[in-house]
């Protein structure tokens, strides 16, 4: 219950602020960044309350993460309620945006320190450990290969294969790609925030109740619904919001199946965290724009969804037929 109140309650209350900010033409880029921390903050808050006496609870690490989430919620609300907006190339640009960035970077540095300080025993007890790197690296490389395959097919279908070739041949692409990889360490709190909530906490719960396959598909659905406010007011415009939400179901179910597979196979939460990071950042690199603006105000039409569904299920969803999903119920 505590988890649901934080992961969903805060998301939808902030969604009302997004709606207000959208109507005022304000910069809403703070919202998706803060929202990514809510699922993990929900898990941690629940554990801090219900498992107080456990000596293996990484208390300092948890308290810091919950506090960091609270700071980001305040900054995000302030970006709409006390906007310090400037026009940057005719786009609204909030002076809260760099503040949020500094909080996330500073928070990520402290995150690593406290994580390492909590010790192996506590990390292992609460799913924070990193193990089986041999298979883990293979899973991450498999994801990169499948992601690029999907990109190539999408370019071929839209007749832009030569454009993709130019992007791949451009040295800037690779410089930015490796810069982005370094950036993982400075933005880890956001991707950890989602995956610790979805894959570590919710996935085993749903699989216990609805079976190995059913639990993962249901998780994809609840993950998609969680994106609702940013689908309507950030990724697209409200008139395309429903199409964006449908598209989100396609992504969250197909990618969710793949990420569930990697987590079940490796028992290493850092694998889905890294995959989530790559999924969100490779589009910035390989779209050739080299800017996160590519994520905002996208054009998503109903006609695009059947193709996306087939392509994503074929590229990422096939793993549901592999061995980890066939064993006895978790």
PLM feature segments, named:
Residues 238-245, 269, 275-330:
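C-terminal membrane module of polytopic membrane proteins
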Residues 1-7:
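N-terminal membrane topogenic signal
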Residues 145, 192-220, 234, 264-268:
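Membrane-interface helix/loop boundary segments of multi-pass membrane proteins
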Residues 8-16, 68-80, 144-152, 221-229, ...:
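Aromatic-anchored segments of alpha-helical transmembrane domains
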Residues 48-55, 116-123, 317-330:
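Membrane-interface capping segments at transmembrane-helix boundaries
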Residues 16-118, 137-141, 164-182, 302-311:
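Alpha-helical transmembrane segments in multi-pass membrane proteins
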Residues 14-24, 75-90, 154-161, 229-236, ...:
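Juxtamembrane "helix-exit" motif on the non-cytosolic side of transmembrane helices
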């Amino acid at each position: 219950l505590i988890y649901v109140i934080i992961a969903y309650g805060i998301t939808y209350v902030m969604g009302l602020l997004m709606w207000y900010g959208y109507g005022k033409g304000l910069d809403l880029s703070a919202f998706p960044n803060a929202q990514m921390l809510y699922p993990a903050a929900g898990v941690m808050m629940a554990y801090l309350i219900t498992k107080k006496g456990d000596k293996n609870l990484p208390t300092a690490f948890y308290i810091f993460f919950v506090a960091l989430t609270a700071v980001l919620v305040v900054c995000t609300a302030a970006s709409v309620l006390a906007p310090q907006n400037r026009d940057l190339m005719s786009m609204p640009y909030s002076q809260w945006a760099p503040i949020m960035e500094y909080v996330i970077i500073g928070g990520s540095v402290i995150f690593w320190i406290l994580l390492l300080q909590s010790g192996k025993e506590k990390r292992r007890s609460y799913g924070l450990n990193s193990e089986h790197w041999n298979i883990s690296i293979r899973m991450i490389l498999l994801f990169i290969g499948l992601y690029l395959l999907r990109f190539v097919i999408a370019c071929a279908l839209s007749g832009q294969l030569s454009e993709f070739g130019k992007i791949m041949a451009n040295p800037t692409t690779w410089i930015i790609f490796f810069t982005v990889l370094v950036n993982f360490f400075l933005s880890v709190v956001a991707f950890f925030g989602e995956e610790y909530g979805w894959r570590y906490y919710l996935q085993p719960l749903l699989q216990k109740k609805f079976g190995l396959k059913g639990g993962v598909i249901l998780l994809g659905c609840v993950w998609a619904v969680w994106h609702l406010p940013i689908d309507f007011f950030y990724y697209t415009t409200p008139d395309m919001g429903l199409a964006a939400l449908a598209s989100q179901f396609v992504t969250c179910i197909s990618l969710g199946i793949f990420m569930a597979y990697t987590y079940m196979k490796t028992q290493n939460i850092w694998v889905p965290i890294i995959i989530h990071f790559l999924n969100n950042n490779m589009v910035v690199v390989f779209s050739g724009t080299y800017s996160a603006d590519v994520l905002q105000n996208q054009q998503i039409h109903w006609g695009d969804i059947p193709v996306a569904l087939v392509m994503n299920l074929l590229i990422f969803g096939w793993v549901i037929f592999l061995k980890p999903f066939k064993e006895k119920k978790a």
